[in-house]
Amino acid sequence: MRFRGRLRVELSREIVEEDLEAIREALEAVGHHLVKGFRNPEEGGRVESWSYSGRVLELVISSGRLRLDEASMRVRRVLEEVLGRTRRLGVRGLRLEDAVVELDGEVRVGGRLPFVRGFEVVGGRTVIHLEPMDEGDLKRPILLRLLRLLNEKEVRARWGGKAEHWQLIKQSRVKLEPPPYTDDPNKVLEEAGLVKRFSVGQWLYTPLAAYLLRMVREVFLEEVVRPLGFVEAVFPKMYPLEVGLRTGHLRGTINSLVFASLPKTYDIEEFEELTDYMYVMDEAPPEEVGRYVRYPEYFLCFAQCEPFYWFFGGELVDDGALPVKWYDMSGPSFRWESGGIYGLERVIEFHRVEVVWLGTPEQVVSIRNDLLKAYEKFMDEVLDLEWRLAWVTPWYYEQSGTVEKVEEFDIDRPGTIDFEVWLPYRGPREDRKTWLEVGNISIHGTKFTEPFRIRHNRGRTLWTGCSGFGSQRWLISVLAQKGFNPENWPPKLREYLERNPPPDPIVLVTYPKTQSGRRELEQLVKYLSKYLRR
C-alpha cells in the first residue's frame, strides 16, 4: 500500500523571504517525524517537494504504511513547534488535495464511497483517487475507516456466503427410518386455523398455537437455560440507529432491518388534512402518511442481544461481577426476509429466547461449552430429534486473524456453531436443503466489547457470547419429525401437556376456512382430547 497527496498548510500570515530558512529547517524536522516509529523508512513518509504562495505552504507527501491523515497531523505539529518558536508563524488550517491510495492487486469494489472520487487499475495495482479533505476530516479516522471498508469489501467478495464455510462438527444417529410423519406442519397449522396470516411474514397465533410455542420454549428454559445459571432480563425492542452502528448491523445487514419513524409533531391539528382524507376515503396511503413522520431514527429488534452490549457500554467491570449470564424472551424480533418468506420457518416477525453472556475469554468459552453440551442433550434426548452441529466462521473474523484452514479449525475462538434439524417433509436427509437452522451459538471475541468500550477494571480482555432459540423454528422441527399426535412426542413434552392442559382450539362458522382444514383440526382435537381443559 502506498499514499501520495498534496497538503496545503494555511499559516497565520503571508510567507516572506526571511521565513524560508526556518521553513527549510522545519521541513527537515518534518522528514524525521514522518519516518519515526518505522524500522524501514520506506514505510514512513517523506516530503517530495514544497512551494509557497501568500500564506499557504504546499507540500507533496508520499508514504508507505503511514496514512496521509496521520502524516498531515505530524506535519502540523512540527511546523507549529518550529515556525512558532523561530518565526512566530502559526498554523491556521490544513487541506489535503489530490490524494491517492495505491493498493496491491485489483480490488473488486463497486458503488460510491465517501471521499472517493474514483478507482482505476494500473499495472495490476488499484489506484484510489480521494476527494479533498479539510482538517476536520483529517482529525477524524475517516481514512482509516475507508481503508478498513475497502478491506472488508474485498474480504466479503472472497469469503462468499455462509454455505462456502460450513463444516460439520457432529451429527446424531439416524432415528427416523422411515419417518413417522412427512407432512408439512406449516400448512397443517394454517389450514387447521391454529395460525392466521396477519401480513407478509407475520402470523396471529391462536391460544392453542401460542401454547405449543410456549411448551417448547418452557422445556428449553427448564432443561438448558436456567440450570446453567442464566437469569431473565427485559430488553427494549426498538433501538436507536447509533446502537446498530456500534454493533455493525446497520452497516452489515441494513437490507434486513425494519425501521421505525416518529411523528414530526405531537400536535394533532397538524395531521388534520391527512385524518380528514382517511375519514372520507377510508384508506391510508403510505406516501401521504410518510409526509407526516420523521426520517427513521430507530430500527426494530434484529439480533435481540444489542441492548446487552449497550447496557455495559462505558462501564468498568470487576471480577466480582463476572461472568454475567442473562436471557431475554420479552418480545418479538423483526427481519425483512424479502422473497424467502415461508410458513413459520422464515418470517419477518418471530419470537426467541436470546441467551447472552459477558466474561473473560476463558469464562466465555467455558459457558459456550456448557451450553453446547446442554443443547446437544436437549436435541438428542429431550426432544429426540435428528440433528447436527456445524461450524460457521463469519466473514468478518478473517480480518482479525481468527480464520483457520477448515481441516484444523478450533471452536474455542470467535465464531459460530449452527444447530440444524432435519425436516422429513422437504426430502431425504442427504440433501442439505432438507435441514433447517433452528439456532446458533456464538463467541464474539471483542467484536462488541471494543466498540461499546466495555472494560475490566484491571485491564483484562473481555469477550461476549450469545445464543438464539427461535421458538417458531423449534416447534416446526418437532412437528416435522414427530407429527401432531402427542403419543409420538418425547416424554418431556407429554409431561408438560399433563401439567399444563392446552386450551381448546378456536372454531367459528367460517373458520377454519376449508373442509380439509376442519378435518385437520378435528384430528388434532382427537390427539389432544385427553389433555384439553374440559
How does the language model describe each region?
Residues 1-534:
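TRNA-recognition modules of translation machinery and tRNA-sensing kinases, especially anticodon-binding
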